[in-house]
């Protein structure tokens, strides 16, 4: 597939077929992530591949608790109706963690986010590779990071960038319309 079509093919997927992701697919997806740019080539990201139904249920529970907290504390109205079923049903959950101290410039120039930025590029690469392999994916962030870290025994010094749901899509997702790019010439106008 041409790259110009690949990024348009990638859609957020919340319905998956009960087909396992193969080790070859997992390897290709994580390798694509590993090739993401990072400050000083520090590659601050690591992956937790979750296929065990009991562990997926714990991740799902973390999402349900976050959803309830948001709904109970005046969050957007859609939060109460948001279904978390896909979390337990997707064949593979890739939790992507990173070391916030490996971000290049660190706190110089008030730019402490290099590690998160490169981990975001890593996740995008993973999702593009999944699409290239005919898999669907979803970058999921609707969870309490502290709860998820506890559930997965993630060391305190690491942060969670997201949980990427990956599997064979149960249906084709339609692309929502995109806004026109806002391009400023030479300075912000």
How would you describe each model-predicted region?
Residues 98, 142, 168:
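Short secondary-structure boundary segments
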Residues 1-20, 24, 28:
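Short acidic N-proximal helix/loop "leader" segments that mark the beginning
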Residues 100, 143, 162:
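Residue-level "edge-of-site" marker
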Residues 43-119:
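Glycine/small-residue-rich phosphate/adenosyl-binding loop
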Residues 3-13, 161-189:
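C-terminal helix-cap and adjacent tail motif
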């Amino acid at each position: 597939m041409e790259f110009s079509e690949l990024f348009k093919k990638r859609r957020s997927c919340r319905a998956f077929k009960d087909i396992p992701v193969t080790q070859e697919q997992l390897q290709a997806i994580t390798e694509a992530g590993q090739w993401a740019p990072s400050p000083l080539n520090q590659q601050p990201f690591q992956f937790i591949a979750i296929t065990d139904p009991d562990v997926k249920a714990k991740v799902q529970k973390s999402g349900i608790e976050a959803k309830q907290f948001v709904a109970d504390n005046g969050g957007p109205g859609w939060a109460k109706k948001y279904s978390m079923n896909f979390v337990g049903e997707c064949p593979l959950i890739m939790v992507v963690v990173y070391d916030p101290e490996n971000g290049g410039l660190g706190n110089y120039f008030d730019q402490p986010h290099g590690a998160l930025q490169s981990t975001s590029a890593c996740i995008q690469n993973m999702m593009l590779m999944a699409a290239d392999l005919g898999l669907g994916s979803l970058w999921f962030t609707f969870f309490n990071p502290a709860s998820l870290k506890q559930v997965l025994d993630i060391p305190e010094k690491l942060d969670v960038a997201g949980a990427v749901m990956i599997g064979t899509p149960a249906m084709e997702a339609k692309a929502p319309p995109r806004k026109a790019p806002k391009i400023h010439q030479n300075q912000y106008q």
